[in-house]
Regions:
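Extracytoplasmic
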Residues: 1-22, 224-229
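Residue-level signature of mid-helix packing/kink "hotspots" within the transmembrane helices
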Residues: 5, 33-41, 93, 127-128, ...
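Extracytoplasmic gate region of multi-pass secondary transporters
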Residues: 7-8, 204-261, 320-321, 325
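C-terminal ends and interior cores of transmembrane alpha-helices
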Residues: 61-75, 288-301
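Paired small-residue
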Residues: 62, 66-69, 79-87, 305-312
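Cytoplasmic helix-loop-helix junction between adjacent transmembrane helices
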Residues: 84-124
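Helix-loop-helix hairpin linking two adjacent transmembrane segments in secondary transporters
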Residues: 119-172
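C-terminal transmembrane helical hairpin of 12-TM major facilitator-type secondary transporters
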Residues: 276-323
Length: 397
């Protein structure tokens, strides 16, 4: 997320240098998600079959390479930059499918919400880091170094990952017998011997519920990740050098609330509450809270009111780690990576049409209210659809 969000901040001086209006900025910001969409299902299938370690590691190397090439691409032209962002998105596409393939093999059912809370808390952590550090780098060394610096971090991470990670607990050289027995207490997901049943997966109402919730969740998520710095800078008049310090507040709260929400969901399950009831309660809090916040934030006239509303939205939205976020592993643990690839393909679409639509609305109307209320309406629809069709019964094994 450092490599995603740095563009959201760096694009402000880039747009001034290259003369890009909101529509062209929307094209640059949304192009990442075209590539992100393309490799989701293939990435999940490869992770399920060959292991999340190698697929995730290669993905990090790929997206770090294209992060490194971003300044060169921008200098050549807008079209080349868009292509570069698409290729970067293809590298990042394997991330969550690989993580789900790893979690299905490493984490028992009653601990998965907390595990996803910890992992997903890296989203706001990386976002905060990029929001604070990117303006500092840009003002000290130029916007180009916002990409060079973070690309180097990616290469370092990949080297460490290949050294210490394992796709399955039984293959880790330092795992204890006690820990291995605990991890496998729910039964180890069986090995995939054939292609996943794609038609049956897509026809499942429960999986459709996850897809819709994921789509609606990501409409608001990607809107904030890509346009929040511009809203703070251009919409509310905050100085560029101060953007990170204001926008970090909602994401710091997300870091805390994701870990708290995951633990709460796991405790509810351990207390005997039905898994599907927990999933629906948490998802209602998440999408319902986000919908309410998006409906009103566009009317904020001061930075502190806007940040307060965004903070509440992020805190309530974090409840999704006990909702649709882990629902894939309830339904099809054997195909967790593939299923995440399917739903995340759907969820990448808002990154293309939602991010671009926001730029188009701003160019045609200048209305931030319309941008945010569209997101709120979509969140409300997702909440209702999930309540009607979600399930936590294992359907594929």
């Amino acid at each position: 997320y450092i490599d995603r969000v740095n563009m959201s901040v760096a694009i402000i001086p880039m747009a001034e240098e290259f003369g890009w209006g909101p529509a062209k900025q929307g094209s640059v910001l949304s192009s990442f998600f075209v590539g992100y969409l393309l490799l989701q299902i293939l990435g999940g299938s490869l992770a399920d079959r060959f292991g999340g370690k190698i697929v995730l590691g290669l993905g990090v190397i790929l997206w770090s390479l294209f992060t490194l090439l971003t300044p060169l691409a921008a200098t050549i032209g807008l079209g080349i930059l868009v292509l570069n962002r698409i290729l970067m998105g293809m590298g990042e596409a394997v991330t969550f499918p690989s993580v789900y393939a790893l979690l299905a093999r490493w984490v028992p059912v009653a601990e998965r919400s907390r595990a996803m809370g910890v992992i997903n808390s890296g989203i706001p952590l990386g976002t905060v880091f990029a929001l604070i550090v990117t303006p500092i780098i840009v003002q000290a060394y130029g916007w180009e170094w916002a990409f060079y610096s973070f690309a180097i971090l990616g290469f370092i991470w990949a080297a460490i990952w290949f050294r210490v990670a394992a796709s399955e607990p039984g293959k880790h050289p330092r795992i204890s017998a006690h820990e291995l027995a605990h991890i496998q207490s729910d039964g180890e997901p069986s090995k995939i011997q054939s292609a996943p049943p794609m038609i049956e997966l897509l026809k499942s109402r429960a999986i459709q519920a996850i897809m819709v919730a994921h789509f609606c969740n990501n409409w608001s998520l990607f809107l904030l990740l890509t346009w929040l710095p511009t809203f703070i800078n251009k919409g509310l008049g905050v100085d560029y050098s101060s953007i990170g310090y204001f926008t970090m507040v909602p994401f710091i709260v997300s870091f805390l609330s994701l870990n708290i929400a995951g633990g709460i969901a796991d405790r509810m399950i351990k207390s005997g509450m039905a898994v599907i009831k927990v999933r629906k309660i948490m998802q209602t809090i998440s999408l319902g809270g986000m919908a309410a916040a998006m409906m009103v934030v566009g009317y904020a006239e001061t930075i502190w009111v806007a940040i307060a509303i965004m903070t509440v939205s992020n805190a309530l939205g974090s409840a999704a780690v006990g909702g649709f976020v882990v629902n894939h592993m309830d339904i099809a643990p054997k195909y967790a990576g593939t299923l995440m690839g399917i739903t995340n393909t759907m969820a990448a679409v808002p990154g293309i049409i939602g991010v671009y639509t926001a730029g188009l609305i701003l160019e045609l109307t200048g209305s931030w209210v319309l941008v945010f209320q569209l997101a709120g309406t979509i969140s409300l629809f997702g909440m209702l659809f999930y309540l009607r069709f979600a399930s936590a019964d294992k359907q594929f094994d």
